[in-house]
Swiss-Prot record:
Subcellular location: Secreted
Disease note: Reactive, secondary amyloidosis is characterized by the extracellular accumulation in various tissues of the SAA protein. These deposits are highly insoluble and resistant to proteolysis; they disrupt tissue structure and compromise function.
PANTHER family: SERUM AMYLOID A, SERUM AMYLOID A PROTEIN
InterPro entries (UniProt xref): Serum_amyloid_A, Synovial_Prolif_Regulator
The protein's name: Serum amyloid A-3 protein
Tissue specificity comment: Expressed by the liver; secreted in plasma. Expressed in synovial fibroblasts.
Key words of the record: Acute phase, Amyloid, HDL, Secreted, Signal
Lineage: Eukaryota, Metazoa, Chordata, Craniata, Vertebrata
Protein species of origin: Oryctolagus cuniculus (Rabbit)
Role of this protein: Major acute phase reactant. Apolipoprotein of the HDL complex. In vitro exhibits antimicrobial activity against Escherichia coli, Streptococcus uberis and Pseudomonas aeruginosa.
Amino acid sequence: MKLSIGIIFCFLILGVNSREWLTFLKEAGQGAKDMWRAYSDMKEANYKNSDKYFHARGNYDAAKRGPGGVWAAEVISDARENYQKLIGRGAEDSKADQEANQWGRSGNDPNHFRPKGLPDKY
């Protein structure tokens, strides 16, 4: 629903041409892949206190794609955090995750959250 309203808004109100819209969708798809890669790496690493780093890194990589990547990172991050709240995860941890998400989306270095000893592979 949110996506369809956004599409209609862009076409009717903003007058976005099809080329810009296709670029936005491409960036969003690439950004979603960046978010998935960060999530997969986090699960693979299974490293204590590394989740904030992977949150920041996924958002950072997605945001580098452009406005579509920023949008995808925000939608995915918000959906994940809302789900975590729904299942009873602590609000304090969710707030810290969102801060890491915003840090990365803003173009700040995700290594700020990198824990010591995390393998260089990540």
